[in-house]
């Protein structure tokens, strides 16, 4: 059976891995997943990531903890295959009054809500992370 929403699966694997205090989680890789993970690394929500495998690429995400507690308090899928959520540059969401990030897929790639505001771009709201 094929996966209906690979991004939601990735976010769920990260959430479950952190709830179980895992060092890392593995998942199938794609360009979109890799760009979201790169963004989470730049924002300090994960330690690092690795892409491995010859024929089937696998993404390994190394989770981040601070004083034994997960750095990610909330990770939530917003736009999904059955209900796409798009916001223009004036209506981009602020997660937890700016303490978290909204991951936005724009015409210039995947970026945070802050970056999209600076660029003057809107797009599809993929997820919230705080």
UniProtKB/Swiss-Prot annotation:
| Keywords, alphabetical | Ribonucleoprotein, Ribosomal protein, RNA-binding, rRNA-binding
GO BP terms: translation
| Pfam families recorded | Ribosomal_S8 (PF00410)
> Under the cellular component aspect of Gene Ontology, which terms does the record hold?
ribonucleoprotein complex; ribosome
Q: Give an example GO molecular function.
A: rRNA binding
| Similarity-based family | Belongs to the universal ribosomal protein uS8 family.
The annotated subunit structure for this chain is: Part of the 30S ribosomal subunit. Contacts proteins S5 and S12.
What role is this protein assigned? One of the primary rRNA binding proteins, it binds directly to 16S rRNA central domain where it helps coordinate assembly of the platform of the 30S subunit.
This one is known as: Small ribosomal subunit protein uS8
Q: What is the lineage of its organism?
A: Bacteria, Pseudomonadati, Pseudomonadota, Gammaproteobacteria, Enterobacterales
